[in-house]
Each structure stands twice: as C-alpha cells, then as structure tokens.
Amino acid sequence: AKEEYDLNVEIIEFTDYVTPNAALADGSLDANAYQHEPYMQAMVNDRGYDFAIAGYTFVYPIGAYSEKYDSIDELPDGAQIALPNDPSNEGRALILMHNEGLITLNDPTFLEATPIDIAENPRNFRFREIEAAQLPRVLPDVDMAFINNTFAQPAGLSLDDALIKEGPES
C-alpha cells in the first residue's frame, strides 16, 4: 500500500465481528475491510453508525463442515446444526440450507433470516446460534457447523472439504 498508493497501513486483527465497527465508529480505526455489505448495513441500522463504503474487496463463501459426516445426505433427522449468530452470516447459512433443499425459508432472499424464519424443517434439524469465532471449537460437538473463511482457514478447514458451500457469486 505504501509503494503503490502512498498509504501507511497497519493491520489489526480482531476475534469478533462487532469490535471492528465499534472501533471505526469511535475513531480508533480509519477504515476496516472484513464485512460484506448486508452485514455492514445491518450494523448501521442496528447501531446507528454513520459509515460509507469506500471500496470493495471480496467475500469468501461460507461452508458447512462436519467431523462426523461426509455428505449432507448422511445427516440424521434431528441433527444439531451450528450457525453464526451475526445477522447476515446466519442468513447466508440458512439460505444455503434452503437452496440445498434441507429447509424451506419463508423468504429465501431475506439475508437476515434466523431459525424463526424457517417455514419447513422436514428433518427436524436443531439449530444452535454461536458466535462465529467459536464455531471451529464447537464443530466436534455438533453434526454440522457453518463457518466462514475468517475462522475456517485458521482452524485448518478447507472450503474444499465443506459438505455444502456458497458458489463464487455469493
């Protein structure tokens, strides 16, 4: 960044999704680059932040991982599914389940869907809403967990190993 744009950039890592926006709002950060637009908009609406999009990077697809099963067809009725508990990533996971035919959502375009928005759950999946950074840690205790790359990659998980995953257009 220094050579190409004459910018001094300091990279600061956070372990959750809320703190970077709070730091941006209180002036501790000048910019952040970690969230997709629906999540940013949810935070603006929920917390009254005055943010603007300065540019776009990319968002890694979210994947569903299991240490117990090799395919979604093996998931038993009543399987315990861990979802990220932030507004848009939880919606992304549920939309992916809807698109795979595992559940039916009332509105499959609603990016902030939660389990309350499930119209049909024919396999009686049980959902646990977990803080995203904790999802790799709970993976051994659930049947399947939706984990985005921010936390999957450091935990040694590869999107290639996901039972289901978003496409590159996500």
Regions found by a protein language model. Give the residues of each.
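Short helix-initiation/N-cap motifs at beta->coil->alpha
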Residues: 11-22, 109-137
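Alpha-to-beta junction loops
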Residues: 25-35, 79, 102, 123-126, ...
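Ligand-binding "clamshell"
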Residues: 42-54, 69, 146, 154-166
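Short secondary-structure boundary segments
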Residues: 36-37, 149-151
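Stable alpha-helical elements in mature extracytoplasmic
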Residues: 1, 16, 20, 39, ...
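Pocket-flanking alpha-helical
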Residues: 17-48, 70
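A conserved helix-loop-strand patch within extracytoplasmic ligand-binding domains
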Residues: 54-103
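Short, polar/charged alpha-helical segment
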Residues: 1-8, 23
